[in-house]
Amino acid sequence: MLIGSHVSMNGKKMLQGSAEEAHRLNEKTFMIYTGAPQNTRRKAIEDLNIEAGHEAMKEYGLSNIVVHAPYIINIANTQKPHVFELGVDFLQKEIERTEAIGAKDIVLHPGSHVGAGSEAGIKKIIEGLNEVLTNDNDVRIALETMAGKGSEVGRTFEELAQIIEGVNHNERLSICFDTCHTHDAGYKVKDDFDSVLEEFDNVIGLDRIKVLHVNDSKNEIGAHKDRHENIGFGHIGFDALNYIVHHEVFENIPKILETPFVGEDKKNKRPPYKHEIEMLETETFNPNMKEIIMSE
């Protein structure tokens, strides 16, 4: 199964270290930020250790890796021109890094309209993406399905479709389908996932989905909260998520876990990914997973 998680990329090893971390977690793919998601500090492309990273990926059988754009990008902002301009400029540079790393998709939160209304936010996102998607490369921007927290744009399939329809080079737009976000937005991810896919296909088209974020949710359906939970421990539940990751629609799509680290002590939190992947690959839920992780 083409499944992995968000892994770190830092120090001198950079991409090579990401591949090694993913391998230790028994992953077949992984997702990275090119730097801290909260700021714009980035290393030069030549310092990302890409060649050694690719060699490690080949050795460990890792493929279809994904980049995630930082949270600070908000091209839906109609109130502050400098925030919009920073977002456009930084997204262009992130696409260059994504191409150099060899990833096909960079996941982007569409943005927040900060009070101007979703229609105004969508117009601004379209403006920004039309500025960004002019340089000639193969990198796709994967718009993420959002939970609808605050003034987030992208809480419905229709909002995402509006963005896609307004962008000139929309062959370079894809979708990152997030199970937690879509559940929190009010879609029946737990109880009737095939109808959700059917609706998505009618509004956007299943061929647009190029990344799957696999997360349980701490919240009831429609809560608009966006709080991830470990696989099988939330309101979506193991059976539904297991069904989703084994669904034929996602067979060749990278499936990325973004579930929380385990442990009460903030200084001793541990990644759950190896165990969550094992549960999904064996299709068997282990209610003692968290205790097992902390006892290792």
Curated annotation (Swiss-Prot):
CDD domains for this protein: AP2Ec (cd00019)
Residues involved in Zn(2+) 3 binding: H181, D226, H228
Keywords: DNA damage, DNA repair, Endonuclease, Hydrolase, Metal-binding, Nuclease, Zinc
Alphabetized GO MF terms: deoxyribonuclease IV (phage-T4-induced) activity; DNA binding; DNA-(apurinic or apyrimidinic site) endonuclease activity; phosphoric diester hydrolase activity; zinc ion binding
PROSITE patterns (UniProt xref): AP_NUCLEASE_F2_1, AP_NUCLEASE_F2_2, AP_NUCLEASE_F2_3, AP_NUCLEASE_F2_4
Residue positions binding Zn(2+) 2: E144, D178, H213, E258
Annotated cofactor note: Binds 3 Zn(2+) ions.
Enzyme Commission code(s) on record: 3.1.21.2
Annotated residues for binding of Zn(2+) 1: H68, H109, E144
Keyword Metal-binding: yes
Protein role: Endonuclease IV plays a role in DNA repair. It cleaves phosphodiester bonds at apurinic or apyrimidinic (AP) sites, generating a 3'-hydroxyl group and a 5'-terminal sugar phosphate.
Family per record: Belongs to the AP endonuclease 2 family.
Name of the featured protein: Probable endonuclease 4
Lineage start: Bacteria, Bacillati, Bacillota, Bacilli, Bacillales
